[in-house]
Amino acid sequence: MGKPKFYDFCVHAVPDGDSTAQEQVSLGRHFGFSGIALANHSDRLPDRKPILPFIEGFEVFRGIELVEENPSKLHSLIGKFRNSMDVLIVHGGSEAVNRAALENPRVDILNHPAFDRSSGLNQVLAKAAAENGVAIGIILRPLLHSRGSRRIRLLSDLKSNLELARKYDVSLVLCSDAMSCFDLRSPMEMLALAEVCGLEEDEALEAISTVPEKIIAKNRPGPGYIKKGIEVLEGEDLF
């Protein structure tokens, strides 16, 4: 088995974050990632579609984190942005939005599902996530910036969601959710933090390597791909 590749699939840049896309990408490369997804919130997008920074040997994925409280409008946003994005994230935070995201197979990741006194997930939603291939984001920035009762609540919600993810085989994605270069952490730091938060070593590794790779493979299919269930075969005797 080769050396694993590490990815951070939720990084924000100007005008959503405080650091430029080039700064975030350069630091991500320096930290040892193989790639990051620049995923600004949909209500903080630049006026023009930005040109992604280029660094040889490093992948920069085009992403978005959709923010919409109305499920019907959320589905419209998913349809609007899906085909132009490598990584499509929904910013949760209510039962209606969480359900809309987890029941839609065109969504890659649900971030920030918790609301009120709920962790944001239950058995029904966890089953929907597993059936539709929607991963749950394990977001580090809120944990790093919180203290006291707020951090205790975040860890409690995370524990509840981890139990459901394990029971129903829901994929997890480990993300920094960095709003500036000061929020970025190296892959080794993120793995260590994930284990402190309750993930097993193999779970954390899958969440920062294997699952992101599967998301990109799904959204960037190979040249022989036409549509789901159909593939062009070359160089083979078909009869």
Swiss-Prot record:
Protein name as annotated: Ribonuclease P protein component 3
TM annotation in the entry: none
Top-level taxon in the UniProt lineage: Archaea
Catalytic activity: Endonucleolytic cleavage of RNA, removing 5'-extranucleotides from tRNA precursor
Coarse class of the protein's main subcellular location: cytoplasm
Broad class of enzyme this protein falls into: hydrolase
Quaternary context: Consists of a catalytic RNA component and at least 4-5 protein subunits.
